[in-house]
Amino acid sequence: MRTHYCGDLSAIEIEKSVTLFGWVDRRRDHGGVIFIDLRDRSGIVQIVSDPQRTPASYPIAETVRNEYVLKVTGTVSQRPTESLNPRIATGEIEIYATSIEILNGVTKQLPFVVSSSESESVREDVRLRYRYLDLRRERMSQNLQLRHQVVKEMRRFLEDEQHFIEVETPILTRSTPEGARDYLVPSRVNPGQWYALPQSPQLFKQLLMVSGMDRYYQIARCFRDEDLRADRQPEFTQLDMEMSFLSLPEILALNEALIAHIFKKVKNIDISLPLPRLTYAEAMDRYGIDRPDTRFGLELVNVAEIFADSGFKVFSGAIASGGTVKVLPIPNGNEAISNVRIKPGGDLFKEATDAGAKGIAYIRVREDYDFDTIGAIKDNLTEAQKQALIEKTGAKPGHLLLFGAGDTDTVNKSLSRLRLVLGEQLGLIDPEKINLLWVTDFPMFEYNAEEKRLEALHHPFTAPNPEDLEDLAQARALAYDMIFNGIEIGGGSLRIYQREVQEKVFATIGLSPEEAYNKFGFLLEAFEYGTPPHGGIAYGLDRLVMLLAGEESIRDVIAFPKTQQASCLLTSAPSTVAAKQLKELSVASTYKPPS
């Protein structure tokens, strides 16, 4: 029977007999004495087999190799001074093995080195193909244990301190195609009908509030059939929450306390509360993005008023067309950034054009506040405009001013992209710094040019600001996103809980009363039976753990992730199925492989 985990042993156990289980991380033979680093998920401890002191274990120790699975019984001993290893938690001790039992060996060559004692760069596809080996590696094991700690602290805070209850909601539900594509599941017992896997438990958690559950949470599995990026998966996990009878400030305060609790318990980091707040309009104006990274400055400056009557038609034309002109002021940019990088062919030019811009205009502020720029700008810049630009941007000699001009969306995208790129390149971002904030007051709707209609920016169950009910199409939503160093980790809103308001929102996004009732009649009916005011939020667990672990991809904090092609290299999913299975489901495939 196991008495301890490998990484939990310390000098307190010296002279005690222990039994351990684990994998051989490394084996060394020093002058006839064999040293084995035994590894389990808790860490590593050194096993010693000495033919003089522990002769019974020695013949077995001679035969073991890396990744063999062992049972080891022995006595904890103090390491000699010259053998102390401060790099591991058990570096003061070693185990003299009285017994070693090989529980299983390795019969094939390892596809990569698992041991943390050797560094080897392994292609991600190989890691995913042999994920069970990859998860033995220290970094990956620690990531999964960190994920467990985060979930454990979420549960502790919500249940023990805030009176939440955990409720599971259905995985097989009906399709309500508003947003990303659903994963569909054919029903065998109802031929021709389909379930959908949930993109979120949104409607069910609202119905739980109607049911009087008051405060609900769930570690929810969600599914979206969409094109993947580094921070997306077709199946993902979120902390899903819903609360009745709380005002918007109360919901924000509760969630701030939750996040502060997680950071303190998991990383021993103190988060200052309350968190800063930006409205959507402020975030877009100052940063060009609704999830700003506020660890550094380089804020955008709107200079449309200065150039509305400019003779430089690129600027004045953009403003006359309903667009804008903004500046990204860069201190010491004259020295750090060459013209080659800004002009066609340069890396910054490419960043801007990839975001939709046609190019980058610039002004270099020289000594005595002389402006160095292209002739078309310089020739059309009045002294009053020059002075106004200096005052508004705070520019000083050495500043480089990068301009975006055009439709507001493109200007924001291009300059916010340049801001982030330059923040990294100029060393302005402290990787150890943590900036959390709320972004609030999002627009209720955005225009879908392809479908020529309004659609909900978040989802159509978000409550509009009561001040904006007279002009719902232009309404602000009672919505809020939590941002962690420029990445959204959670988002939520107060919900609509009155049938007439919900019907107005459905009508605004182009749903007829018949369509709305067909898709959401069960929710509309529930609103007739005493629905409490309520609101909620969902946190992307994968993304939050990724950030806490300092990883670049959520695939490194998920046990068995999919690739960016939504496939599992370990199990070869998705796969074809037998024609008999399809027939039972009344389904036929129309796919024909390319010739």
Curated annotation (Swiss-Prot):
Residues 202-205 are annotated as: Aspartate. L-aspartate binds at E178, R224, H458, R495. The record marks H30 as: Important for tRNA non-discrimination. The keyword Aminoacyl-tRNA synthetase applies. ATP binds at R224, D225, E226, Q233, E488, G540, L541, D542, R543. It catalyses: tRNA(Asx) + L-aspartate + ATP = L-aspartyl-tRNA(Asx) + AMP + diphosphate. Aspartyl-tRNA synthetase with relaxed tRNA specificity since it is able to aspartylate not only its cognate tRNA(Asp) but also tRNA(Asn). Reaction proceeds in two steps: L-aspartate is first activated by ATP to form Asp-AMP and then transferred to the acceptor end of tRNA(Asp/Asn). Belongs to the class-II aminoacyl-tRNA synthetase family. Type 1 subfamily. PANTHER family: ASPARTATE--TRNA LIGASE, MITOCHONDRIAL, ASPARTYL/LYSYL-TRNA SYNTHETASE. This is Aspartate--tRNA(Asp/Asn) ligase. It comes from Microcystis aeruginosa (strain NIES-843 / IAM M-2473). The gene is aspS.
